[in-house]
Amino acid sequence: MDGFSRRRMLMTGGALGAVGALGAATRALARPLWTWSPSASVAGTGVGVDPEYVWDEEADPVLAAVIDRGEVPAVNALLKQWTRNDQALPGGLPGDLREFMEHARRMPSWADKAALDRGAQFSKTKGIYVGALYGLGSGLMSTAIPRESRAVYYSKGGADMKDRIAKTARLGYDIGDLDAYLPHGSMIVTAVKTRMVHAAVRHLLPQSPAWSQTSGGQKIPISQADIMVTWHSLATFVMRKMKQWGVRVNTADAEAYLHVWQVSAHMLGVSDEYIPATWDAANAQSKQVLDPILAHTPEGEALTEVLLGIVAELDAGLTRPLIGAFSRYTLGGEVGDMIGLAKQPVLERLIATAWPLLVAFREGLIPLPAVPAVLWTLEEALRKFVLLFLSEGRRIAIDIPDVNRPS
């Protein structure tokens, strides 16, 4: 499958040949056959090509050229000036990069401002749940996604995981920000920069022997399937868990929250034919692309330890066992084992019993419950975590890499 790109596939095999090639590749990589229909997408139609073999034909050649020309340091310096959606691009950018960025910053025609506003308000209103699930649910689940763990670990960002996690948190904050897609917001900027980072990693990581030896046969990282795996570990997982916890979510708020993530996927370069149009479609796609691929890797376990170490800095490690137990409760014991979360049987049983009561109280469904004091300690620790990583004042520079992780 060397050099297997969407363009080459369509040129050399035709539809029937492509299906055969994709089926063989799926078996080799132990991936389920791609059967999700584009009729369930925001586009409503599509050619149905497996996103495993679709990358970013707009961004990838441009960023490869920028890297090969040695322009990354100068470009990063210029891009530090670009922080708001309504800002003009900085002067001095290479022409091909400027052209790409001007195109990439355009919102999709189907974006609904009212839905985006409502979705952002929902994220703010449910901030304690959304923030905790992003960080201690989705963030830790990402370490059980082998490709994501290895792409992070062996890329330049893997050398400074605290900075890498902060940048990931920045994306989560910007998506949920009340001003995310407004002129004075910054989500368009964050999305375009992240899309360029992904393109740079696709160019660089295949040059890493360490990544190539552990990639499971993948020749180019961060396919559109990989992006949607991450998307589901965030959007679909968070909505599913909130409903399981008994958080009150009405239909309009759920649809608005989904719309925020639909627009964000588009802005990150995902083809509209892979973006679910409804939560039912999202759950169906998640069961196909996310659930079967969760697994243990040494890289993922190492990243879990780094993340929990950062959380421990909040209070010198006093609540680390509690946070670990909450994460196991949130992710489930199977995923907890995959990523090396220590078992905390007593705390896990306590949280499983009392956390739903605490949620019901916060949602105004029951009076103040009689829960162990440790649960209030947990809630306070979660609030500190959310404030630390989703703080508006935390300005993070998203830089394009020009090297892999140093060996």
From Swiss-Prot:
Main location class: secreted
Record note on modification: Exported by the Tat system. The position of the signal peptide cleavage has not been experimentally proven.
Cofactor binding annotation: Binds 1 b-type heme group non-covalently per subunit.
Consequence of gene loss (knockout): Cells lacking this gene exhibit reduced growth in medium containing poly(cis-1,4-isoprene) as the sole carbon and energy source. Additionally, they show no detectable Lcp activity on latex overlay agar plates, being unable to form a clear zone and to produce aldehydes. Complementation with the wild-type lcp gene restores the wild-type phenotype.
Any one GO BP annotation for this protein: isoprenoid catabolic process
Cysteines joined through disulfide linkages: none
pH dependence of this protein's activity: Optimum pH is 6-8.
Induction of the gene: Weakly transcribed during growth on glucose. Strongly induced by poly(cis-1,4-isoprene).
Impact reported for R164A: Loss of catalytic activity. Still contains a heme group
Keyword Heme: yes
InterPro entries: Lcp-like, MPAB/Lcp_cat_dom, TAT_signal
Domain of life: Bacteria
PROSITE patterns: TAT
Family statement: Belongs to the rubber oxygenase Lcp family.
PANTHER family in UniProt: ER-BOUND OXYGENASE MPAB_MPAB'_RUBBER OXYGENASE CATALYTIC DOMAIN-CONTAINING PROTEIN, SECRETED PROTEIN-RELATED
This protein's name: Rubber oxygenase
Species per Swiss-Prot/TrEMBL record: Streptomyces sp. (strain K30)
Phylogenetic placement of the source organism: Bacteria, Bacillati, Actinomycetota, Actinomycetes, Kitasatosporales
